[in-house]
Amino acid sequence: MAAKLARLHSLRERLGATFSSHPNELIALFSRYVNQGKGMLQRHQLLAEFDALIEADKEKYAPFEDILRAAQEAIVLPPWVALAIRPRPGVWDYIRVNVSELAVEELSVSEYLAFKEQLVDGHTNSNFVLELDFEPFNASFPRPSMSKSIGNGVQFLNRHLSSKLFQDKESLYPLLNFLKAHNHKGTTMMLNDRIQSLRGLQSSLRKAEEYLMGIPQDTPYSEFNHRFQELGLEKGWGDCAKRVLDTIHLLLDLLEAPDPANLEKFLGTIPMMFNVVILSPHGYFAQSNVLGYPDTGGQVVYILDQVRALENEMLLRIKQQGLDITPKILIVTRLLPDAVGTTCGQRVEKVIGTEHTDILRVPFRSENGILRKWISRFDVWPFLETYTEDVANEIMREMQAKPDLIIGNYSDGNLVATLLAHKLGVTQCTIAHALEKTKYPNSDIYLDKFDSQYHFSCQFTADLIAMNHTDFIITSTFQEIAGSKDTVGQYESHIAFTLPGLYRVVHGIDVFDPKFNIVSPGADMSVYFPYTEADKRLTAFHPEIEELLYSEVENDEHKFVLKDKNKPIIFSMARLDRVKNMTGLVEMYGKNAHLRDLANLVIVCGDHGNQSKDREEQAEFKKMYGLIDQYKLKGHIRWISAQMNRVRNGELYRYICDTKGVFVQPAFYEAFGLTVIEAMTCGLPTIATCHGGPAEIIVDGVSGLHIDPYHSDKAADILVNFFEKCKQDSTYWDNISQGGLQRIYEKYTWKLYSERLMTLTGVYGFWKYVSNLERRETRRYIEMFYALKYRSLASAVPLAVDGESTSK
């Protein structure tokens, strides 16, 4: 706290000193802000005014420039201007300037939020306002302080807690008890009751070591199982003498001289994960014929690829551990009796390419009975509590045991995962995919404009509950947690915000919390592989792909005909919604005549054959047709309906490579960018948004290019320059293609992902057992917040019924 106050005082004093030495310059600047009247100014607006003013004399404003460039927003209530200043990711200060009196004062988070609320209320709310603050519960909890440590939580946790827990022999007893507690459905693993003390454990390990060093390394565990039982050792150490000896050496090293790296390796080696539940309630979750349906996109692909890799890793580790246990993975989603031609009405569906993974579907129900039709992800909240109870019963029925890990996906899945983990006492993992608060700017302060349509009061509350309850959080990128130097991260945006009339969040999450871990996914390499692998190419699809791209026929699957089929293709594939910005790409292309001359545009989005139930998609459809007419794009553009066959989509990416085209991802914000990974894995040069995950996936100019969709003219110029360089240098396209592939192999594969997830589950499961990582105090606070606030918000959401739509 002292450091924070010192920083605030330093900031206030710096600004005050700048006012004293440069009063005229700063009056001129802040007057520009005040003259815009009551409202909120975003970072780019603040800097635009600043840059316009300093153009004539930059030296005068230099002392203030660093402060202003760190400001993320300003609240203007004349004569006051309040600034939210972010010196670095995860660190925030708040100040207020009275332009009339040249006075500067620091603000607490609560004071800043109360000031901000006046934008809506028009006056300070003098009544007591509910404030949500998780900071006191984490005050004594270890956390890193450097931005570079964000997202590397498990490494920090291991360093801190291994030194704390293993400082003397007595402190090692939790590890002994943890190993003794290991069992699966009543079958003891690792240690039996013959070992009662650390001395006994070390003695048995030494005897086992001596025995193993005297037999062939490939001796199966079954040949010395009984001898080990007499020593107090059970199955789980390994499947052969060498692997058992390696595990024993790891533990002996830990008992002698604890080391965080060895601890993580040991915990990743021992058996801890056999039953996994993955929750993804909303949308149409199935293996085919669903991509492009409302609320159905990258998350479905992510989970299906995830479970295949995870099952393979679980089977491999179980075999290496010398166990005869069958793992089970359940993807739990909503059952839709009105399945509209999909398998979403089928209770259990085997996941293709797996042996022990099923999709388990459980219906939404209320006092009106089972809900038959799809509803928007924004309308699910009144159903989730009852749904959780039904899911718990179905899981126990299918698994005949509690899961070892529950993984939530998106806001609804994470809330159900929270309720289940709380009920069953199971390790919980959270994957956000996208936090809507960042996708819809100012949806917190101007909640009234959004809430009747999107029910964000429910969703933001559910997000806060889940992210604070969970044991660990997986993100695909650093940006998802803490943004970049200039942009705020998705989770970071939940540090402090206000929902006027409901509550203020003065400390909602700490991005330095060691529960955060970056674990990036990949693409299914049996589907997405480089276009150069000619013997694997699916040429049987080429006639269908040529029909999609070049047919002279217009129908419900493809609209508009390309005039020049010899041009390279600018290709994009996404859902048709505002944030994905497919209409923005079309407008950018339409405005730039040079770009139209250089390349054709092919977009895959929406469904021409079915009237969407989603209002946002309906609006984008109308806008798209308007842009195509406005810029006379017939002959230059091909608009293809959403494609459900991902195997053919893989070959479609490779076919675009054959045209020497590019993949463009133009989203205003993209949490990760699975299509970016897919395109790069196929060798297709990729040009993607700089907002969100693609900014990390792509190294600009090496493995692809960045564009800013908020500056569409510059984005179009980047595309023009790319194609011009390709014309001038025949190796340029290949260099970007190969750079993308190299980036994928280094960081973005499902094999790396599944190995990391297994290790994280072991490490967090261990620390949860041996320490206060369960955060009991926090969870009691969450229980109260859930009961008193979330439930009332959820009950206020109109209950969807069959025969009408409340979709958005």
Swiss-Prot record:
Record InterPro entries: Glyco_trans_1, Sucrose_synth_GT-B1, Sucrose_synthase_pln/cyn, SUS_EPBD, SUS_N
Induction field: By anaerobic stress. Up-regulated by sucrose, fructose and glucose and by sugar starvation. By submergence.
Broad enzyme group: transferase
Coiled coil regions in record: none
EC number: 2.4.1.13
Post-translational events: Phosphorylated at Ser-10 by CPK23 in developing seeds.
Highest taxon, organism lineage: Eukaryota
Regulation: Activated by phosphorylation at Ser-10 by CPK23.
Keyword Transferase in record: yes
Modified residues (Phosphoserine): S10
UniProt keywords, alphabetically: Glycosyltransferase, Phosphoprotein, Stress response, Transferase
Cystines in this chain: none
Catalytic activity reported: an NDP-alpha-D-glucose + D-fructose = a ribonucleoside 5'-diphosphate + sucrose + H(+)
Pfam families: Glycos_transf_1, GT-B_Sucrose_synth, SUS_EPBD, SUS_N
GO BP annotations listed: protein tetramerization; seed maturation; sucrose metabolic process
Entry GO MF terms: sucrose synthase activity
Region (GT-B glycosyltransferase): 272-749
Tissue expression notes: Predominantly expressed in the leaf tissues. Expressed in seeds, and at lower levels in roots. Expressed in leaf mesophyll and phloem (at protein level).
Subunit structure, as described in the record: Homotetramer or heterotetramer with SUS1.
Function, as annotated: Sucrose-cleaving enzyme that provides UDP-glucose and fructose for various metabolic pathways. Functions in developing seeds by supplying substrates for the biosynthesis of storage products.
Family as reported in the entry's similarity comment: Belongs to the glycosyltransferase 1 family. Plant sucrose synthase subfamily.
Entry protein name: Sucrose synthase 2
Source organism (scientific name): Oryza sativa subsp. japonica (Rice)
